[in-house]
Amino acid sequence: MHQDQPSHFRAQEYGTKRKSDHGSVTETEIIEYVSGQPGVVTVTASKENSAPESAWGDTFFFYDPDRNRPENQRLPFATVVVHDYVGWDTESQLDRDGIFRVNIAVGRSGFEQLLGYPPAQHQAHHEEFDYAATDVLIPHPTYASQGWVSVLNPAERTSVQVRQLLDDAHALAVRRHERRLDARQT
């Protein structure tokens, strides 16, 4: 456990929760938690960092401990998305007040363990899920086939699981980074 975790995540680990919000976690708490992981670069899309306007407000987490990977070579291991991408990703109805989605790259094996089928078979299962439901682990509506899962507004049912999946995704990103370094050295 990280010493600088938001208090809510610490409380959830020990089986307690804030009474005022039934265990819900804010997007700020998630951003602070993931940003506190070693080697994480956090980018919140904005006009100032020349991100496309459609992404403004969305947060992307990359593992780049040396902070030297070119931006066009960074792949996030998790994101926090706060609005729909019209024409691309609208099934979660993120334009509702107070709704955000945590997206986590769990990999093929993790995806299959969580959902019971491999990511490559997601299209056959797509209609089984309510992508607008809150506090439920679901396949990512657009990137499930690449091993991504999502939770809208994690709360009592999913906040502990989301934290663990974020930790696992970070560890997976670390391993991928180390493999890239090893490949360059051989």
Please describe what each predicted stretch is.
Residues F60-Y143:
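Short, conserved beta-strand/beta-arch hydrophobic-aromatic motifs that form part
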Residues H2-D4, F9-V86:
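Charge-rich, low-complexity N-terminal segments
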Residues F129-T186:
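Well-ordered alpha/beta subsegment
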Residues Y33, Q37, H125-H126, D168-A173:
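Conserved short hydrophobic interaction patches
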